[in-house]
Regions:
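A solvent-exposed, acidic/Ser-Thr-rich amphipathic alpha-helical stretch
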Residues: 7-60, 64
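Low-complexity, intrinsically disordered terminal/linker segments enriched in charged
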Residues: 100-112
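Short helix-adjacent coil turns
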Residues: 1-6
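Exposed beta-sheet edge and beta->alpha loop/turn motif
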Residues: 67-96
């Protein structure tokens, strides 16, 4: 499915972090993040996930860094409430072009 194609872009040892994770917790593994996404998809249907801005950066300390902003629309399955919200995603890439770092920032409280 679409999620399989999404995860093909990630290295097997990729680390996933963001505001969904408590400050003192380690980043999630690929399997842990996949499970968390499946839990989310049990509660919500994704209507759209549209990129509105993307920028490639190269810093001395961190090469191959991409930051993007997305406009996401979801429908809560329990009551069909539609919510549209912004998500900022930062990705770091390895030499093979696979994503090794995924950091997503969005306000989960907007779904309440």
């Amino acid at each position: 499915g679409d999620m399989d194609a999404f995860y093909e872009a990630f290295a097997d040892d990729a680390k996933f972090d963001g505001l969904f994770n408590d400050w003192d917790n380690d980043p999630l593994t690929k399997d842990q993040f996949m499970a968390a996404q499946m839990d989310f998809l049990k509660l919500y249907s994704v209507n759209s996930f549209d990129c509105v801005w993307v920028k490639y950066y190269e810093f001395d300390s961190q090469l191959n860094y991409v930051q993007s902003w997305w406009r996401v629309s979801v429908t809560r399955k329990s009551d069909n409430k539609v919510t549209v919200f912004p998500v900022m995603i930062n990705h770091g890439f390895n030499e093979e072009g696979k994503i090794v770092r995924h950091n997503e920032l969005w306000n989960e409280a907007i779904l309440d």
